[in-house]
Amino acid sequence: MGNIVKKEDYRYPYRQKREKENKTKHFKVLCTIVCVIALVSGILYQKGIIVIPTGNNKTDTREERSTEDTQEDFSRFIQQVFVDEVTDNSITLNYTLKNKSPYEIEETEASLGDVGIDAMRESLFVSENRLASLETFEYKKLTDEQKLIYDIMKKMLKQNLESSELLEYTEYLGVTSGIQAQLPILLAEYNFYSKEDIDTYLELLKLIPDYFMKIENFERQKSKDGLFMSDTTAQAIIDQCKEFISHSSDNYLIKVFDNKINKFKGLSEEEVSSYIDTNKKEITGYVIPAYESLTDTLTSLKGTGVNPNGLCGYKKGKKYYEYLVKTKTGSDHSIKEINDMLDKKIKQASKYMSKIITDSPDIYYESQNIKYPYDDPKETINHLQKAVKKDFPELSDNISCDVKYVDKSLQDSLSPAFYLTPAVDNYENNVIYINNSAKYDLSKIFTTIAHESYPGHLYQNCYFASTNPSPVRSIINIDGYTEGWGTYAELYGYYLAGLDRKVAELLEKNTIATLCLYAKSDIGVNYLGWDYKKLEKYLNQYGFSAAQSRIIFDSMVAEPASYMPYTLGYLEIADLKKDASEKLGSDFILKDFHKFILSIGPAPFDIIEERMDKWIDGVISK
């Protein structure tokens, strides 16, 4: 599926009472990233076994291959991996490439990919073969960029194989990160580059009932295996589906399609009319019935879930949680190490905030009545685009960003704002969605927009794309890197807003503490076995009400490890920055550090750290 980078408003009231209308808006857990191949749950292990070309001499061994030939072979290998991945389904292809001809990709039949145990097993088989193919290359003969790709792919393929005994724990549905929640936006933003794209889109709509049926069958099997979701989670998804299809004749996807078709150049009036009529028939005849069927299935399965608490309540739940955290964050830290790290960060942030408030009581009151320089999203983005130039590497001013607003039927299930990753060959054109729901205070959205735009997701994605990386990097998704950077950018936003520095520091530490509390709650519920009462007791000491604790508990049960990429990803980047600053001393230049992190692109943090040590050595030796 398309790559939706999403973000929750994390500005949580910390130890202080707020007005009632401000209390609940901070607690809705939203997904991290739906990666570019989310339709089939995973990365770098779809269809197609790679055969490595070895030249004309069939007796060549790795040692006999020249450096040049090895590099050429590796380039062909990763190019084939990229092509296989993006052609796995039509949504992935449409969201990844505007122009398919340079990759010799022919028009393919409409496809949503596949789901279910058999599809996952096939994916593991491909992972195993790709890993074997990867390891045939003589590492020392690769270029530095190829070595980086090799290291990332090898690590991720091995991680994929670790899921072989955990496939039944996979969850395609989710209140915010589930396919049923993401699909409307993915369809709405499906790119109509050509008339063929319109035709493919309409064919995709017909495939949704069968696709959802496979998910329903998967959920039925989970029910039989004692792994079905909690009633609370099921009901939330049911309510979400009902809201989306509540106005079938005036559905969001009908309105969006009509608008796009009317703007599409080159169609006759008859073609426009025909397309509009066909789309309406298919939305009402295929999409809405698919959501109705999913709703009916979930309703029938309610009550069959045997575990109302976190993942550790299942036989292999703790192991699956460890796997989720590792794959989502890109961090090699154990759960115990992460838990200890969170305790330390909460203590440090609390101590720092207490000192600021004690030394300067007015700072606290000022922080409670912040007025940002802009509350209009477009004006905020324009301001941030200019403001980042001091501390962040230069990016072309030709980058565009279209600000759109979430349809009312989707407001309850989507975050305050989110960024849509553009095609790799069309990265200059970006889209950010703003949720106009009454529960979100858009006057306080400044740092959220910093997370999504500059210096956050939009800037990070466009800067990396501007370095002309290998296309295969676009299908490698490390949530911890992208959301860690987004959180880093959000915190930086306090300083870009022109606030008093002490106020900015207080707000920054408050957000860090809040994120750490969410991550602690996640570990507590899903790994340590906290029930609601234990979580409530823990959060109460930080000023959370019972109602707020209930919302957090339900969120952690519904979507385990969702907060970890934001929190742990940020902490990893902050530690890298601290390490670089300490080692370089007076030679540390913030803009150069940012350039290093952005240029290396999404990667596991141990790989980034290894490259950073070399970068530091290079700076010192100059």
Region spans (language model):
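N-terminal maturation segment of proteins
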Residues: G48-K622
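Gram-positive cell-envelope targeting signals
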Residues: M1-S66
